[in-house]
Design a protein with these regions (language model features):
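Adenosine-phosphate binding glycine-rich loop
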Residues: 254-255, 261-306
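Positively charged, low-complexity intrinsically disordered leader regions
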Residues: 1-56, 60
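Rossmann-like adenosine-cofactor binding region
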Residues: 195-271
Length: 306
């Protein structure tokens, strides 16, 4: 595995391998067992979209793995002033050992990998959020022990989170249901992918239909970065797509609730449900650290070292 560009590129075995490695790294961290698997290496972190969790978890993770993380904003790169991405990729490949990029267009991530000669990790694009979903899958498996027989349900906008959850959930063997309003479906390429999974995938407009019998309920903000001008209109469109006590009652007893954060209480999730499931949600947030460390090791370390 040379890069993590999108979960569509990974096999089931590769996903499970990353989750197993993340579990191992989490155990070692909790027991003060050092694992400097990237000693002396430098990860360049390109942020064209800001983020608390992505920066802190990658920077901390790289430190714990014995390496160094270098923060690069749009202001630090000539790419923001018109330099072709292929030139940026080739220059950074001479200085760094890996690149993590959080940006708008998936094409930028793909081109960094195409023209560069070092591993590239997708920290988020408008199309997908693979690192977050690997953390989600890790958290789900911690609670339930395996993915067998589970139903995962996403409620809200058919955005990058929905796209990656669909792909990741189906690839590890879960049933996946998604509820979105008309006009806000997941990406067409992802819906095409689901055709190979038959009735293991369901796309609904009724959130209660999607949530029925679910073991995991997941949501995300109604308004993603770059959509701020649509905020008030989206509040009206998504008002019925909220994880609340009524929707939770449609799921299986003891259902897990996840949210990638930041959460807007009273919109996509109620304050009451958020606080009742806060331990699950913040375990999910912690697991970003461990899952991303596993990704960095998988693409940057020598296989013999782990």
């Amino acid at each position: 595995m040379k890069n993590l560009l999108k979960l569509l590129d990974l096999s089931t075995e590769e996903i499970i391998g990353i989750l197993d490695l993340a579990d191992q790294l989490k155990y070692e961290r909790k027991h003060n067992i050092p694992h400097e698997l990237l000693k002396g290496q430098t990860l360049g972190m390109i942020f064209q979209k800001s983020s608390t969790r992505t920066r802190v978890s990658f920077e901390t993770g790289m430190y714990q793995l014995g390496g160094h993380a270098l923060f690069l904003s749009s202001r630090d790169l000539q790419i923001g002033r018109g330099e072709p991405v292929q030139d940026t990729a080739r220059v950074l490949s001479r200085y760094l050992d890996g690149i993590m990029i959080r940006t708008f267009e998936q094409k930028e991530v793909e081109n960094l990998a195409k023209f560069g000669s070092i591993p590239v990790i997708n920290g988020l694009t408008d199309f997908c959020h693979p690192c977050q979903v690997l953390a989600d899958l890790m958290t789900i498996r911690e609670k339930f022990g395996s993915f067998s027989g589970l139903k995962m349900c996403f409620i809200g906008d058919g955005n990058n989170m929905a796209n990656s959850l669909i792909v990741g959930g189906l690839k590890v063997g879960m049933n996946v249901a998604v509820a979105t309003p008309d006009g806000y479906k997941p990406d067409g390429a992802v819906l095409e992918f689901t055709k190979g999974y038959g009735d293991k995938f369901a796309l609904e407009t009724d959130p209660f239909m999607a949530a029925s019998g679910a073991d995991i309920l997941i949501t995300d903000t109604w308004t993603s970065m770059g959509e701020e001008a649509e905020k008030e209109e989206r509040k009206k469109i998504f008002k019925d797509y909220q994880i609340n006590r009524q929707l939770l009652a449609a799921a299986n007893a003891g259902a897990m609730v996840q949210h990638c954060l930041p959460a807007y209480r009273g919109q996509e999730i109620t304050e009451e449900v958020f606080e009742e499931h806060a331990d699950e949600i913040f375990n999910e947030a912690e697991n970003r650290l461990h899952a991303q460390k596993a990704v960095m090791v998988a693409v940057m370390a020598d296989k013999k070292d782990w």
